[in-house]
Amino acid sequence: MFIIELTYTAPLDRIDAQMKAHMQYLRKQYASGRFLVSGRKIPRDGGIIIATGGTREEVEAIAKQDPFVTSGLAEVRVIEFRASQKAADIQQRIEAEPSRS
């Protein structure tokens, strides 16, 4: 499994201008089965994606296709880890998490 960390290197108005393209990219990766969960960091200085499948090199290549990265608006870091435990109620916990803008 992988943690993909995006860190913005541009002002939020430039990030917001690329948000539609970023969301299309995310939908494509969810449809492929690669991405499991994603969201913005708090404070809003980037985002986190949990991904699965493939090699580190493949995931790094996919992460570098993010429009925020290709437009020079964010840096990306990929961390590989082996998940050894999970909460039985992970879906309910994600859904119960309070929304913060």
Region roles according to the model:
Residues 1-101:
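Conserved, structured core segments of small domains
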